A protein has these predicted regions:
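Short acidic/glycine-rich loops and adjacent helix/strand connectors
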Residues: 1-296
Length: 296
């Protein structure tokens, strides 16, 4: 049995091929088009995977994508009413995901009607959990997925045992540890997609002097909020405008619009411009950001 995994229309677009239970290849599109964090459809990565496996498109039995457009539909519809522009952008992504069979056929100059594969849409965070647990050496494990946003959730947790996963809870948009980290990264003068690692490294050179404020930015009390955390939304704008993101073009690095509000500057001081020098204050804020993340 040949299974093709496709991560498309998201940062780090990639593909993987599993043949008879063995991972043959897994690679990101950026390795071929030389675009950092390339999004779009990973046609070159898919071509490489099939070549490495010595098979053709006709030999693929199953295709899995880490996105379920129908997950949390009620929440999506609610935000569509509140944020029409955001809804239109997400609708464009939905159209692309439903067109993956056509994009796959086009990558091989084939007719979509010739595809014999069965397509599977896997909820975003369940795909994260599965990709970690099912290749681990553990028979049982606690599972956690936390990122910016996927299928309108930012965090999911549960347990794994044998070949099964049990989902115990999730945190829905707009509350997100990933968007929290990205927002403060932007505030500290690092606006590009994927810049968070710079701030994580910077944290080692500072002291968490603003931890009290960061505990208001991300609120977590296991006694009063047993099902997760909450963002202090006054510090953010994504819940009002939707996170502006570009994922469609494989020839470009993804972009993310502004996430933090004026309240963050009011409470923490003026936001740093990208060209401004790094001061000890910025290092201390980075340390506070990281410390609060680790607390939660």
């Amino acid at each position: 049995m040949n299974i093709l995994g496709i991560n498309a229309y998201h940062g780090n677009a990639s593909a993987a091929i599993v043949c008879d239970g063995k991972l043959i290849a897994a690679v990101e599109e950026e390795r071929f088009n030389r675009v950092k964090y390339a999004a779009g459809f990973p046609a070159l990565a898919i071509q490489y995977c099939l070549k490495a496996a010595g098979i053709t498109l006709a030999d693929i039995d199953h295709v899995a994508v880490p996105r379920d457009p129908y997950a949390r539909m009620a929440t999506k519809l609610l935000y569509a009413l509140k944020m029409p522009s955001f809804a239109r952008e997400r609708a464009k992504v939905l159209v692309k995901f439903t067109g993956i069979p056509e994009a796959l056929a086009a990558a091989f100059d084939s007719d979509p009607k010739n595809l014999k594969s069965q397509f599977h849409r896997v909820e975003h965070h369940q795909a994260h959990l599965a990709s970690a647990f099912f290749v681990s050496p553990f028979e049982q494990a606690a599972l956690l997925s936390a990122d910016g946003l996927g299928d309108f959730a930012s965090t999911m947790w549960g347990t794994g045992a044998g070949s099964q996963m049990k989902i115990d809870g999730a945190v829905a948009f707009p509350h997100s540890l990933g968007l929290y980290y990205s927002a403060v990264t932007q505030y500290l003068g690092f606006p590009k997609y994927g810049d968070e690692y710079k701030v994580m490294g910077l944290a080692a050179y500072g002291q968490p002097e603003s931890l009290d404020v960061f505990r208001q930015i991300v609120r977590f009390d296991p006694n009063s909020r047993p099902n997760g955390f909450e963002l202090g939304l006054d510090f953010f704008v994504h819940h009002r405008t939707g996170p502006e993101m570009s994922w469609a073009d494989a020839g470009k690095t993804p972009t993310v619009g502004k996430l933090f509000s004026d309240e963050m500057a009011r409470r923490l001081g003026q936001a740093r411009l990208p060209e401004a020098p790094l001061e000890q204050r910025h290092k201390n804020l980075s340390a506070s950001l990281q410390a609060r993340l680790e607390e939660v």
